[in-house]
From Swiss-Prot:
Its main location: secreted. This is Rhinophrynin-33. The keyword Coiled coil does not apply. Changing E6R: In [E1R,E6R]RP-27; loss of stimulation of insulin release, loss of TNF-alpha production effect on mouse peritoneal cells, and no change on IL-10 and IL-1beta production effect. The lineage of its organism: Eukaryota, Metazoa, Chordata, Craniata, Vertebrata. Keywords: Amphibian defense peptide, Pharmaceutical, Secreted. GO terms for biological process: defense response. Expressed by the skin glands. Changing A8W: In [A8W]RP-27; loss of stimulation of insulin release, increase of TNF-alpha and IL-1beta production effect on mouse peritoneal cells, and decrease of IL-10 production effect. One of its GO terms (cellular component) is extracellular region. RP-33 is present in skin secretions in higher concentration than RP-27. RP-33 may be a precursor of RP-27 that is activated in the skin in response to an appropriate stimulus.
Length: 33
């Protein structure tokens, strides 16, 4: 059971890794404004 919470942590870490990709275009648009 202790291993379950440990596996749940790496999952959220992978999601944020994909967020930076869409966040880049937003930062570029902000600079254009």
């Amino acid at each position: 059971e202790l291993r379950l919470p440990e596996i749940a942590r790496p999952v959220p870490e992978v999601l944020p890794a994909r967020l930076p990709l869409p966040a880049l275009p937003r930062n570029k648009m902000a600079k254009n404004q």
